Curated annotation (Swiss-Prot):
Signal peptide: none annotated. The keyword Mitochondrion does not apply. One of its GO terms (molecular function) is pantothenate kinase activity. It comes from Levilactobacillus brevis (strain ATCC 367 / BCRC 12310 / CIP 105137 / JCM 1170 / LMG 11437 / NCIMB 947 / NCTC 947). Coiled coil: none annotated. ATP binds at G90, S91, V92, A93, V94, G95, K96, S97. This is Pantothenate kinase. Its EC number is 2.7.1.33. It catalyses: (R)-pantothenate + ATP = (R)-4'-phosphopantothenate + ADP + H(+). InterPro entries: P-loop_NTPase (IPR027417), PanK (IPR004566), PRK/URK (IPR006083).
Length: 307
């Protein structure tokens, strides 16, 4: 991709110098538990990429807190603790979830006196039952398949300092919202919001998810690479689903393998690639930081917004 003029671009080697002497707080085993099962992130990636990123987030967080204090003083209002929200966007299968979980772990390590929490916007998809009623099952993941009113209200409650907020839970295992199961957000200092739509501007909304984010990251890669990771992930899902009849992927796991792979290729072509090209990729240049991946999920370049 051609570098936008409003970003500073860094090679991996340049970026790693920004925190070259920092101590790595993870082991290989703890990293294995964090990463998605087809993501090849290494301890070296954590050292080279994520440690400097956490230090940058720390600067952004400190600046944000100071601005909140100064604004309260100017308005002669009591100072309130308003959560700092980090948005992480990008295509399916590009590694957003791993990036979000890793950032959560590292922030918990370095921000020892702050509450760090993570939420995914998948929980705000309409249930499969509701999607069928709206004739939207073939559009699952597209902007109209999300309950944006509920997501915006959730983020507003977070910023407003509501003490306990419930968020619906989505399960990739059952491919649906889990009834009567919730994640609880308890007045965090930092909330990480991960999802394909964190930078989108739906045409029927007056306020957007990005209006609530204070620092945003877009995880980027060539679509042909993302497709290979998508298909690789599908193969791994089949390998883990064949012993569990409750798993959404079970029928594909025990059925004809070639037919299952052909279906996954159609899903990528007709749904996920289309969604990427029409709705996700156009949001890339709205991010504060772009993390670019190449073969093997290796991060080779980072772009940081200048202004």
């Amino acid at each position: 991709m051609r570098d936008p003029i409003n970003y500073n671009a860094f090679t991996r080697e340049q970026w790693q110098q920004f925190s070259a002497d920092a101590t790595l707080p993870l082991t290989q085993e703890s990293l294995r538990q964090i990463k998605a099962f087809n993501d090849r992130i290494s301890l070296q990636d954590v050292q080279d990429i994520y440690i400097p990123l956490v230090h940058l987030v720390h600067l952004e967080f400190d600046h944000y807190r100071q601005l909140q204090r100064d604004k309260a003083t100017f308005l002669k209002q009591p100072q309130q603790r308003v959560p700092f929200i980090i948005g992480i966007a990008g295509s399916v299968a590009v590694g957003k979830s791993t990036a979000a979980r890793l950032l959560e772990v590292l922030l918990n390590h370095y921000f020892t006196d702050q509450r760090i929490q993570l939420i995914t916007t998948d929980g705000f998809l309409y249930s499969n039952e509701e999607l069928k009623k709206r004739n939207l099952m073939a559009r699952k993941g597209f902007p109209e398949s999300y309950d944006m009113t509920a997501l915006i209200q959730f983020l507003n409650d977070v910023k407003a300092g509501k003490e306990l907020i419930k968020a619906p839970v989505y399960s990739h295992k059952v491919y649906d919202i889990v009834p009567d199961q919730f994640d609880y957000i308890m007045h965090p200092d930092v909330l990480i919001v991960e999802g394909i739509n964190t930078l989108q501007l739906p045409t029927n909304e007056q306020i957007y998810v990005s209006d609530f984010t204070d620092f945003s990251i877009y995880v980027d890669a060539d679509p042909t690479l993302i497709e290979s990771w998508f298909l690789e992930r599908f193969e791994l899902l089949l390998a883990t689903a064949f012993q569990d009849p409750t798993n959404y992927y079970y029928p594909y796991a025990i059925g004809d393998h070639d037919e299952a792979i052909a279906k996954s290729k159609r899903v990528w072509r007709d749904i996920d690639l289309k969604n990427l090209e029409e709705y996700i990729l156009p949001t890339r240049n709205r991010a504060d930081m772009i993390i670019h991946k190449t073969f093997g999920h290796r991060i080779d370049r980072l772009l940081l917004r200048k202004y």
